[in-house]
Design a protein with these regions (language model features):
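Short gly/ser/thr-rich secondary-structure transition/capping motifs
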Residues: 31-32, 104
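DPxDG-like acidic metal-binding loop motif
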Residues: 1-30
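An extended, acidic
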Residues: 37-139
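Short, structured interface segments
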Residues: 28, 34-37
Length: 139
């Protein structure tokens, strides 16, 4: 949900696992009513990342490719993934998840909010954010 060009709430449901991820601006991120927090890892080689197929080929990170950006971001918020990056993705694919990451204590970078539909996004915990961004400078 957007209000005044700001994402104020978001919901992602995984019917396979019966998991409901929800975030509200300034009120936190939740999974089935349990508060979420991003990973506390700070050694990038110990981290697990998600991206699209181009990201998997580009990066030397430990990677998973799920094919669902919204759920990938929910997993970053839950600490299941340590980071997520994707280029040229639609805002509606990442709006809810980006709020979830932020409300779970993570950082979302390169989110060119609502200037056009295709955006670039990088999301992670504060502990690895700078290292991740440096690795992805040419992505």
């Amino acid at each position: 949900l957007q209000s005044n060009k700001e994402i104020v709430s978001g919901l992602i449901f995984d019917p396979i696992k019966d998991e409901m991820f929800f975030a509200e601006k300034n009120k936190g991120s939740y999974l089935n009513n349990q508060r979420l927090r991003v990973s506390k890892k700070n050694v990038i080689d110990d981290c697990l990342f998600s991206s699209n197929h181009n990201g998997v080929r580009f990066s030397n990170f430990n990677m998973r490719y799920t094919g669902c950006a919204a759920l990938d971001l929910a997993y970053v918020a839950a600490g299941r993934f340590d980071g997520f990056f994707h280029n040229d993705i639609n805002i509606w694919d990442v709006a809810a998840g980006s709020l979830m990451v932020q409300e779970a204590g993570g950082l979302v970078n390169d989110l060119n909010k609502f200037n056009n539909n295709a955006i670039n996004i990088r999301a992670s915990s504060d502990g690895i954010n700078d290292k991740m961004l440096k690795e992805l400078e040419n992505f």
